[in-house]
Regions:
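Glycine/tyrosine- and acidic-biased, solvent-exposed loop/turn segments at the edges of beta-strands
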Residues: 1-162
Length: 162
């Protein structure tokens, strides 16, 4: 990760323009999208309108570990009434527990689980890239608590297919 000293956090109204044409408009709250955001094409025709709350789509479902709603448990991205977007789950200590992507209510791509104590990878689970492809889901890799690789499906398949 590279730190850029000359960068600033976006805070306040934001308008993205190409020449005098507004392409995107919204509001940043300490670097997070907040409130209503609109995207327009070059003919000023509305392409997309979304509402955010502190960086998350407003429809998204947020669960917390405590009644005061201070410790986030998971965020389920909801767009147009369906699970769409990046999913995040957190351990009680605040470390990331899992992340992956939903598309049309289906898990897609690689989902990663993390150990609670040190935040290192625990498991990679591969789902189909296409939500309508019904091939089987499988664990592609697994690590122990120290971060040592204990299972790699590709290496395993190479060994048994020799």
């Amino acid at each position: 990760k590279k730190r850029i000293d000359e960068s600033y956090m976006l805070h306040g109204p934001y308008i993205k323009r190409i020449d005098d044409q507004t392409i995107e408009e919204g509001f940043f709250y300490f670097g997070l999208k907040h409130g209503r955001w609109v995207r327009l094409n070059r003919s000023d025709i509305l392409q997309d309108k979304e509402t955010y709350f502190m960086g998350w789509l407003n429809e998204s479902i947020r669960f917390f570990w405590d009644p005061k709603k201070e410790n986030l448990k998971e965020i389920i991205p909801i767009k147009y009434g369906e699970k769409n977007g990046m999913y995040y789950a957190f351990h009680l200590n605040g470390n990331l527990a899992a992340k992956g992507e939903y598309q049309f209510n289906n898990k897609i791509g690689v989902w990663i689980e993390y150990h609670s104590k040190n935040g290192k990878k625990k498991r990679e689970i591969k789902y189909n890239k296409d939500p309508y492809n019904k091939n089987k889901t499988y664990i592609s890799r697994e690590w122990n608590l120290n971060g040592k690789l204990i299972y790699d499906r590709d290496l395993f398949l190479k060994k048994i297919n020799k």
